[in-house]
Amino acid sequence: MDQPISVRTNLVSGQGSLRDAAEIVDGRVFLITDPGIVAAGHVARLEDIFAAKQIACHRFDAVTSNPSEADVDTCRAALQSAYGDSGADWLVALGGGSCIDVAKGCSTLAASGGRMRDYLGHQPTAQEQAPVLAIPTTAGTGSEVQSFALITNDDTGRKMACGGEAPAVAILDPDLTRSQPPFVAACSGLDTLAHAVETAVTNVRTTASLHYAHEAWRLVERNFEPSLRQPDDLNARSAMLRASAAAGIAIENSMLGAAHSMANPLTTHFDIVHGQAVGQMLPFVVRFNAENK
């Protein structure tokens, strides 16, 4: 149970920390986001921050929920169109877990080629990848600190955990989560809660991963409801971002469980939001485990 913890992502947190993005990246930047984040005004803010530092930035803003291999392929083609074979020096993911997963997948394909299915369950061969700066606008997936990307197989519809590099840096700015609709915030929080529970009880947990699972649970227990009831409570929103990252680190160093496995078909076949699906399955899994010790 005692194994060294692996934390591959440097965390920058605090209100207004989005402005630190221009101090982190340099050279050619490729920004990956979605239409909702554009509409919320976050993309314009970040582009202005880059422009003030004369940082070249091209944008891809067509990420969809529950991204597929085709989504990553389209993003990779946009990167090629923007910067040619030289590629980008940094990929910046601004959005929820879908945007971050597409960015990680795009970085992998740009360096190693192929399709996402080629990296199902394992890391790509040693090729230098463009680093990813993850800037989550939801507090839930933990993708900002994980090396695997959750991508849908175009042929089977199954979710694939595809190996790659974890983001080099993640910015946790609670200002960015205020634009979340209440339903999105609730589903994201349920995802973090499920991550904390499942990583705490998995058979492959370690002492270190259990520490992060417990920290995530502590933060969720104290801040989930306040973050929903008082959307402008930036302390609660910041705590939920930290909870998401802590649970993500626990996942990276252990495993998830049946609630996530059972949720994936719901998202694939019924287009249910990931956090909602996990939240619906978790009580049944907890009850089953309690009755079958």
Regions found by a protein language model. Name each.
Residues N10, V29-F30, H58, D89-V92, ...:
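Structural motif
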Residues A88-C106, T137-S143, D271-I272:
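Glycine/serine-rich anion-binding loops at beta->alpha junctions
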Residues T9, A111-T207, N292:
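A glycine/threonine-rich phosphate-anchoring loop and its flanking beta-alpha core
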Residues L46, T74-R76, C99-S112, V145-Q146:
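Short Gly/Thr/Asp-enriched flexible loops that form oxyanion-binding sites at enzyme active sites
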